[in-house]
């Protein structure tokens, strides 16, 4: 019998007993190293997390709601359960059923849909924070997201607290058709409820914020903050270029360009957002607060190598 037929190889003959068993069980995470889209450097994941998911080149990575809550609130916070809605009312199917895509997104993110709500304090002042999760079907706005937005607004009204929204979305969810488009006026009315109650509504625009989200609640804030480099617009730049058949200006639809044109009030590094929000809340709520969060200074990563290298 040959070595091939009985599954043996020359390597197995020289490997010490038990060694192959040890290595076969070794599990290496897929995201141990993360590539920076700007510098193309590889950044060690733990260093990226310690640096608030901002790369050494200054690129602000997209982050999950749990991290966003952790970075934003003074300390402890309480997540609020999001409302349940009818699943797949249109029985939509393209390459696969909508229900299958929902199940995959839920498994990937551990969330029921694209929005998460939490309450806590920022600078000692009570606040309701709503975060869109781009990892859940591109953060798209559907019935569940619309209901979550309204619940966050109602929570703010009940607590007489300001509402802060971190946007990150590709637009309305096409699998829900007109039902998703209906969420645009519904969320707009929720913002108006806050305004009538005299409660601040602050929007933090993160990468990307586009489509129906931009055309509704994302641009209705009393104050608009944007993270550096965030793509903000209705249609994407490639779609616009193909439509008008012209090259767009450098940095078109990026946070800094919109700041220059007066579309956003301030571009703020992620580390400075909690302190910035605290100052704004004190002014808008006309309250002194009890504490002032310090800027979250990201440590300089030690484990950064060129693309393809190893540490």
Curated annotation (Swiss-Prot):
SUPFAM superfamilies xrefs: ClpP/crotonase
GO cellular component, one term: acetate CoA-transferase complex
Keyword Chloroplast listed: no
Cited InterPro entries: AcCoA_carboxyl_beta, Acetyl_CoA_COase_Trfase_b_su, ClpP/crotonase-like_dom_sf, COA_CT_N
Functional pathway: Lipid metabolism; malonyl-CoA biosynthesis; malonyl-CoA from acetyl-CoA: step 1/1
Keyword line: ATP-binding, Cytoplasm, Fatty acid biosynthesis, Fatty acid metabolism, Lipid biosynthesis, Lipid metabolism, Nucleotide-binding, Transferase
The enzyme's E.C. designation: 2.1.3.15
The CoA carboxyltransferase N-terminal domain, residue ranges: 32-299
Region entry Disordered, spans: 291-311
Domain of life from the UniProt record: Bacteria
GO BP of this protein: fatty acid biosynthetic process; malonyl-CoA biosynthetic process
The keyword Transcription regulation is annotated on this UniProt entry: no
GO molecular function, one term: carboxyl- or carbamoyltransferase activity
Reaction equations catalysed: N(6)-carboxybiotinyl-L-lysyl-[protein] + acetyl-CoA = N(6)-biotinyl-L-lysyl-[protein] + malonyl-CoA
Subcellular location: Cytoplasm
Primary enzyme class: transferase
Cited function: Component of the acetyl coenzyme A carboxylase (ACC) complex. Biotin carboxylase (BC) catalyzes the carboxylation of biotin on its carrier protein (BCCP) and then the CO(2) group is transferred by the transcarboxylase to acetyl-CoA to form malonyl-CoA.
HAMAP family with a match to the protein in the record: AcetylCoA_CT_beta
Record's subunit section: Acetyl-CoA carboxylase is a heterohexamer composed of biotin carboxyl carrier protein (AccB), biotin carboxylase (AccC) and two subunits each of ACCase subunit alpha (AccA) and ACCase subunit beta (AccD).
Protein family according to the UniProt entry: Belongs to the AccD/PCCB family.
Record-linked PANTHER family: ACETYL-COENZYME A CARBOXYLASE CARBOXYL TRANSFERASE SUBUNIT BETA, CHLOROPLASTIC
Annotated protein name in UniProt: Acetyl-coenzyme A carboxylase carboxyl transferase subunit beta
Gene: accD
């Amino acid at each position: 019998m040959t070595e091939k037929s009985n599954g043996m190889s020359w390597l197995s003959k020289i490997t010490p007993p038990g060694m192959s068993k040890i290595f076969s069980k070794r599990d290496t995470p897929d995201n141990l190293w993360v590539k920076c889209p700007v510098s193309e450097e590889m950044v060690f994941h733990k260093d990226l997390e310690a640096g608030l998911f901002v790369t050494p080149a200054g690129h602000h990575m997209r982050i999950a709601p749990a991290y966003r809550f952790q970075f934003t609130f003074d300390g402890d916070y309480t997540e609020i359960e999001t409302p349940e809605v009818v699943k797949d009312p249109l029985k939509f199917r393209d390459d696969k059923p909508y229900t299958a895509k929902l199940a995959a997104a839920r498994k990937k993110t551990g969330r029921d849909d694209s929005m998460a709500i939490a309450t806590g304090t920022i600078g000692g002042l009570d606040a309701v924070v709503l975060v869109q999760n781009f990892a859940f079907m591109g953060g798209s706005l559907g019935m569940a997201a619309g209901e979550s937005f309204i619940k966050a607004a109602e929570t703010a009204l009940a607590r007489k607290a300001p509402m802060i929204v971190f946007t990150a979305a590709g637009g309305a969810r096409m699998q829900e058709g007109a039902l998703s488009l209906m969420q645009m006026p519904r969320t707009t009315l929720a913002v108006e409820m806050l305004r009538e109650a005299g409660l601040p509504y602050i929007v933090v625009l993160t990468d990307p914020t586009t489509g129906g989200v931009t055309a509704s609640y994302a641009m209705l804030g009393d104050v608009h903050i944007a993270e550096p480099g965030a793509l903000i617009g209705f249609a994407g730049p490639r779609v616009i270029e193909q439509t008008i058949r012209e090259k767009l200006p450098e940095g078109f639809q990026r946070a800094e360009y919109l700041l220059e044109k007066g579309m956003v009030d301030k571009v703020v590094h992620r580390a400075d957002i909690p302190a910035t929000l605290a100052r704004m809340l004190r002014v808008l709520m006309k309250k002194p607060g009890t504490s002032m969060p310090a800027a979250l200074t990201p440590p300089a990563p030690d484990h950064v190598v060129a693309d393809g290298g190893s540490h």
